[in-house]
Swiss-Prot record:
Protein name according to UniProt: FAD synthase
EC number: 2.7.7.2
Presence of keyword Cytoplasm: no
Subunit structure, interactors included: Homodimer.
Species assigned in the record: Pyrococcus furiosus (strain ATCC 43587 / DSM 3638 / JCM 8422 / Vc1)
Family classification: Belongs to the archaeal FAD synthase family.
Protein task: Catalyzes the transfer of the AMP portion of ATP to flavin mononucleotide (FMN) to produce flavin adenine dinucleotide (FAD) coenzyme.
One GO molecular-function entry: FMN adenylyltransferase activity
Biological process terms in GO annotation: FAD biosynthetic process; FMN metabolic process
SS bond list: none
Keywords: ATP-binding, FAD, Flavoprotein, FMN, Nucleotide-binding, Nucleotidyltransferase, Transferase
Lineage: Archaea, Methanobacteriati, Methanobacteriota, Thermococci, Thermococcales
Keyword Lipid metabolism: no
Known pathway: Cofactor biosynthesis; FAD biosynthesis; FAD from FMN: step 1/1
Length: 148
């Protein structure tokens, strides 16, 4: 008998002001396995990393992501950096990083191996390059269109 276990892919991100670039990223990640789980960054993590709170709270971002057909489950991350405990609980076979995430694949792999997590870590390329697929550019267009 073959192994019928599903291949679990995990991605993480802020996903604030969901846009077409996010959807393309999630579709590409889903194609790496059978099950896609998204870790949505905690509001405190966003505030610390970006210097501002997210536009939408984590609960709303999670609910929006759950409505995307490529996504099988969504969890809200813990405050702080990548939670090894959360990754252990999710048991990923693959961790897919976005093209703009500032984590080193090799450093993350080393950290995971040290904790006994043997997930493959890969960085997905930009599939959809456009100002319409960058949250900061969308915010800038909103300000220029409605506030000036």
């Amino acid at each position: 008998m073959g192994d019928n276990r599903k291949v679990r892919v995990v991605v993480g991100g802020v996903f604030d002001i969901l846009h077409v670039g996010h959807v393309h990223f999630l579709k590409m990640a889903k194609e790496l396995g059978d099950e896609l789980i998204v870790i949505v960054a905690h509001d405190e993590t966003v505030k610390r990393r970006k210097g501002r709170p997210p536009i939408n709270p984590a609960e709303d971002r999670a609910e929006l992501l759950k409505s995307i057909r490529y996504v099988d489950d969504v969890v809200i991350g813990e405050p702080g950096e990548i939670s090894i405990d959360l990754i252990k609980r999710l048991k990923p076979d693959v961790i897919a990083l976005g093209p703009d995430q500032d984590f080193s694949c090799e450093e993350l792999k080393k950290r995971l191996r040290k904790e006994g997590i043997n997930a493959e870590v890969i960085r997905l390329p930009y599939l959809y390059k456009s100002d319409r697929a960058k949250t900061s550019k969308i915010i800038q267009r909103i300000i220029e269109t409605f506030c000036e």
